[in-house]
Amino acid sequence: MASSENEPFCVKFIKSPENSEYFFKAYEAIKQIQSDESLQLTEEREALLLKEKDKSLYICDPFSGAAFSHLKKLGCRIVGPQVVIFCMENQRRVPRAEYPVYNMAMADVTISCTSLDKETREDVHHYVQIMGGCVYRDLNVSVTHLIAGEVGSKKYLVAASLEKPILLPSWVKELWEKSNQRIIRYSDVNMTEYLCPIFRGCTICVTGLSSLDRKEVQRLTALHGGEYTGQLKMNESTHLIVQEAKGQKYECARKWNVHCISVQWFFDSIEKGFCQDETMYKIEPASTIKSVPDTSTPTGGNSKPNSRTLYDVSQISNISTSCVNESAFNSAMASRLDPPADTLENLDISSLQAPDDLLDGCRIYLCGFGGRKLDKLRKLINNGGGVRFNQLTGDVTHIIVGETDEELKQFLNKTQHRPYVLTVKWLLDSFAKGHLQPEEIYFHSSYQQTEMPSPFEPAINLTANKMSSTRDPLNHTRNHQADEDLLSQYTENNSTLIEDEHPKTSNTNSISQMSMHEDMTTCTSQSGLADTSTIIEGGLFSRKQFMVLGFLEEDEACIIDIIKKSAGKVLSSQKRAIADYAVVPLLGCEVESTVGEVVTNAWLGMCIEQEKLLDPHSNALFTPVPFLEGSTPLRECVLSVSQFMGAERDSLVYLAGLLGAKVQEFFVRKANPKKGMFASTHLVLKDAEGSKYEAAKKWNLPAVTMNWLLQCARTGRKADEDSYLVDNVPEEDKDESFISQTYKPQAIRLSMHAPCHLENHPEALTKAAVTPLDMNRFKSKAFQSVISQHNKNPQTSGGESKVLQREPSLHLDTPSKFLSKDKLFKPSFDVKDALAALETPGGPNQKNRTQSTPLSEVIGRNLQLAIANSTRQTAAVTASPQLKAAEKKEFDNSKLLINVVICVSKKLIKKQGELNGIAASLGAEYRWCFDESVTHFIYHGRQNDMSREYKSVKERSGIYIVSEHWLFACSEQQKRVPEALYPHTYNPKMSLDISAVQDGSYTASKFSADTSLQQDENSELQLQQNNKFGETSDDQVKKAAGDGNPQNPSKDVKGALTQTLEMRENFQRQLQEFMSATSVVKPRGSVGRAGFDNSPCTPEGARSTRNGRSRVLEALRQSRQAMTDLNTEPSQNEQIIWDDPTAREERAKLVSNLQWPDSPSQYSEQLQHNMNDAGGNYTPAKESLTDTEIAELEACEFEPKSAMRTPVIENNLQSPTKPDHLTPTPQAPSIAFPLANPPVAPQPREKPVQPFSKEETLKERRFQLSSLDPQERIDYSQLIEELGGVVIEKQCFDPSCTHIVVGHPLRNEKYLASMAAGKWVLHRSYLEACRAAKRFIQEEDYEWGSMSILSAVTNINPQQRMLAEAAMRWRKKLQGIKQNMGIAEGAFSGWKVILNVDQTKEPGFKRLLQSGGAKVFAGHSSPLFKEASHLFADFSKLKPDEPRVNVAEAAAQGVNCLKPEYIADYLMKELPPPMNNYCLPDAIPYVRVTGTGLSRKRKTSGDVSDVKRSRHY
């Protein structure tokens, strides 16, 4: 049997009695493709005769026995049968490994190990190699997974930073065990269960933390795989969390080389998901940190290098003065605002009686407190119903500061939404007076407040409180400036003199209008005026010269500091040089010098915020605002400003305050004096979107643009809101730029006393300079031929002549204006005529067509793409003015995808440029990297793709993940097609070509809207008819209303019918071909298919759910589309000829599942099937349906019923219409299978509406709201009251409530108590459905736990799902008992409970138990044991001096002595959990194991009915 070198390759199967079924399956598979000479079935004894290694491939199964060991010893190439099957199925080579490979479960996996003992590491290596994986000793870029025994090694930190999965060795063992049972891949095992815990191998000790923080660290450590110890032990403790670098533990830890880190390390590790590098959080002794003594003498270590050329001039005399005065100011402010130290220390909390919801909506972070002070403040916040945060996040609304903190300053400098930074006196005064105090008078002195909370004050002057105490620093500034003037005589020419000799105009508008990201608190004491000779190259204002005029001295110093930090140069007013910009207050001031542009501090602030130089004329707030002094036309108005941020928002708030208006953050309909809210009268915003805008429309309150405010300021009178509604803003008015920067006036003089001079500028100031387009620059012959033909035709259109009449008014600049050596010349071209020349000449139906020649389409798209790119790259340079189009078109290519922002996946990187170009030509924006502004993610992959990029995008709600073909379809069809038709799994070769059918229905629907609207002037009433019979988009309605040319109805209808019938034949032909390839019987029960012709057509383009359209019908359409998961994407017309069995089965499934989106009968069948399916196995088309869509699953039934009561639609489209009736929208013929008989409209399936019983109608509905946003609370509270309900505003559960509306199921008191009492626990979509029906409706389909809610809301975790199901289960159970027995039961009925828990938690437990019908004893004395049935105790939370119950004595008398966790688990789990698992340690000896887990007292109690006992089974 010894093989020679010339022996051919052979596959040998080693036969043994233990061979598995895979062995014979692999043999048969190879036998089909391998010749008999190269395939052998060998016995074990023959294999043992082999003397040396040969070239054969040996197939062994199992990897054991004498033959396997012999072959392995010789070094033969051995694989298992699973390897053969895997490689044949995946067309891969059999691995040439130096070791046997049993299966390919870990193919494509490369692992490296860290922190494992030698034996475990060798086991891991062995199993990985035997499963087809690769092993590296060192960590490199090829490694895909890291196997770790514990955290903290260098490999661990590098792998975590590279986001590589870090797993436990048990993952490899689990893969090996499962791969022995069946053929699997490593991805089939859930890796999340085997991820290395964050603190694996860490033994953590703490010092200096409060008791509550210590317990929190202990809990989280155990939760994340670490070990917590109270004592610091040598060779055991690995980490010591230190509050301050002192103490015995700290000193010992340093000696024993234990990591001494801050508590931030602990929480950052949890937040980022892996153990952080300890060196970044190391706590050093104070002596090593502070090595420089506190002296007034400047040293190199704590002062910035002086950039001036004269180094021998000392300025030391000025520094000490500023330091002393700044200290005096700080101490004065602190003494005024902060309470004495002993006030909080000696405060008796019990003396402060305040409402439970005093702090409702306040999210509070405590900073700079410790010990007893911190505990008292926590109790105050809990008692007042506030939410306390342990970490600084963007959700915090109030920060209460004790001692100053540098980390807090850094957070405030970075955050966009600054919370209130207050002293503790605000909290104490609020509790003492029983209502929230205004925050303005409690600002902390050490932290600057940039928001403007009160509209009554013109602005919060940053330094208003400093004026009386900082006179000396101001004098120092003047002296300092005098020194600068002296030194400037000897410096270079680029230094700048700053003088304050010209008179300042006092103005109430201070620098606080701007949202500055710089820290301005030291701009007066440590001003940067000495650095005026330094130019920071490449800064925002590099090579720009400024003048600062009209501000108070301290504000001026701050503005100068801001400009210089951005590389700008500041000139004095007496300098002869011409400044580029003069910065003035918002209302302007007199400018004597010659400057290029006069801008406001709002312009400066927004330039800093956006980090780019903005066009001064792109925003009305960038130039001085005309204001009629002394007028307050908005005295009775309460404004809310939305969608504006930073300096722009502050300026609007300031302006509104000057006009007499009140400005508040929340937009409310009713006043709430308790919370200091007024009833809003106006909403000022940018765009017609957002929750506040929807609320304004609902409440009929004006939603206006900021131009309304500017007009009020300009005229001194309240302007008409209808002229400034945000709905009426045309698209061309939304452009940012108004005046080209190429034109700059030589001198502009603005007077504070005559602000109306802005209106007297010449026309050149309001019209941009246009560079005419040179037609000779286009070399294309096709383009030149089109232009030449266009020039020969006389212009007859009135619209075009209008445009041409405007040409002579162009103001062209001479080359000396724009050909400057310091400025880049960027011309703008007027290409309107060129694009118009490419359009197809208009016909009789031109307004309904957008067809053009292929050549013009290509050229037009490329021109638009070039213009879009040019505009994007030159944002600072304004383009030519947009002239009105000669002929209004129904569609504009550049606005098809307006407000769409796309990002292309890395998988499609090669197509990214092409896809971005298509998107830009359709009016969309694109991003090279995914960010928060992206609305559509272009991706291609499988249904459950495991790529990190896909999962990260999928976690974000509201993002469309679509195929690249969606963009192609939008471009081809010249409309925004529905995203649901093009998911990321879309394959054009695997779908039917039915897109044309949708176009047909769209045309017919549009025609119906046109004709019916022309017959009746009441467009609003007709719109309601369209919503019922053929929902028409808003754009179509507007088009029809404005169309003055009469149409030919019969001609269009016949054309639509002919086109649709052709589509029907084509569609039918495809289906017949599919059906001929399969033997699947056509599904029965689809009687309603004959009713296609009368089914409502829903064009996908109509997306608005509030503007004249039923939100119920819209959400039903979307939700049904998601639930049935229709595969109706447009595709190419390809057919399969080869008879593949798998493909035939798939075609059969496609035919059986194929349904038309416009057929209500088929939809109802599929929906009914899905709703009745207990498993609920359907895949939603998107991550989670919106609340409104969920609401429509049931509420939509009202709309079809109302439609059925209206006059029946005639089948004959040509029939005359009675003049006294509105013409209903005719329906487009649908595509259906040919029927022998004429189509008959089926009777719609009506779900019988159960009328409310008399008792239910009369019963008052009392609601509680939980886990909702503040704006949602306000909106839903208003809705409930309008419908006749009552809203209970309590922080805790109220037994009188009948319904609780919950955002998300949480294991809190409100939710559990509602569950125990059998209340209705509803999703917020219930209220949306009630809003649509305008009355309270049945609750069943909107209850947490119902299939309609759980199937639609997919982003809940298992615990939330268990809570949701438990709520419905208890509600049904308790209501059933009430109906059958006539008695009101609770979940805890019959319980008699003794509580021995923490005093702060006892009221909550008591309310929870009592809501479920339990009787709770006051106290826990021994005589109560005879009556009690349950005792709940938690000694770990009790203080040493608090009394404790005698558990042993209670258990001896038959009381169930349990941990409090039993209460929640009893409610959540379907079967009551065994009491033995929750038994207190002292009661274990007395537990008698019974079938029900009940004690003797419960078993023998005669007063407990069978109904009560049945709950335990």
UniProtKB/Swiss-Prot annotation:
Family as reported in the entry's similarity comment: Belongs to the TOPBP1 family.
GO cellular component terms, A-Z: centrosome; chromatin; cytoplasm; nucleus; site of double-strand break; spindle pole
Protein task: Scaffold protein that acts as a key protein-protein adapter in DNA replication and DNA repair. Composed of multiple BRCT domains, which specifically recognize and bind phosphorylated proteins, bringing proteins together into functional combinations. Required for DNA replication initiation but not for the formation of pre-replicative complexes or the elongation stages. Necessary for the loading of replication factors onto chromatin, including gmnc, cdc45, DNA polymerases and components of the GINS complex such as ginsl/sld5.
One annotated GO biological process: DNA damage response
Organism: Xenopus laevis (African clawed frog)
SUPFAM superfamilies xref list: BRCT domain, Uteroglobin-like
Subunit structure: Interacts with cdc45. Interacts (via BRCT domains) with ticrr; interaction is cdk2-dependent. Interacts with atr in the presence of atrip. Interacts with recql4 (via N-terminus). Interacts with gmnc. Interacts with cip2a; forming the CIP2A-TOPBP1 complex.
Pfam families (UniProt xref): BRCT (PF00533), BRCT_TopB1_SLF1 (PF23294), PTCB-BRCT (PF12738), TopBP1_BRCT0 (PF21298)
BRCT domain span: 101-189, 194-283, 354-444, 530-621, 629-726, 892-984, 1253-1344, 1383-1480
Official protein name in the record: DNA topoisomerase 2-binding protein 1-A
Main location: nucleus
Span of the annotated motif Nuclear localization signal: 844-850, 1508-1511
Annotated signal peptide: none
Post-translational modification: Phosphorylation at Ser-1131 is essential for phosphorylation of chek1, and thus for checkpoint regulation.
Modified residues (Phosphoserine): S1131
InterPro entries recorded: BRCT_dom (IPR001357), BRCT_dom_sf (IPR036420), BRCT_TopBP1_rpt8 (IPR049936), Secretoglobin_sf (IPR035960), TopBP1-like_BRCT0 (IPR049542), TopBP1_BRCT_1 (IPR044737)
PANTHER family listed in its UniProt record: DNA REPLICATION REGULATOR DPB11-RELATED, DNA TOPOISOMERASE 2-BINDING PROTEIN 1
Gene3D superfamilies: BRCT domain
GO terms of molecular function: chromatin binding; chromatin-protein adaptor activity; DNA binding; kinase binding; phosphorylation-dependent protein binding; protein serine/threonine kinase activator activity
Impact after mutating S1131A: Prevents phosphorylation. Prevents role in checkpoint activation
Disordered as annotated region, ranges: 289-308, 789-809, 1031-1053, 1086-1109
Disulfide linkage: none
Name of the gene: topbp1-A
Biased segments, Polar residues type: 789-799
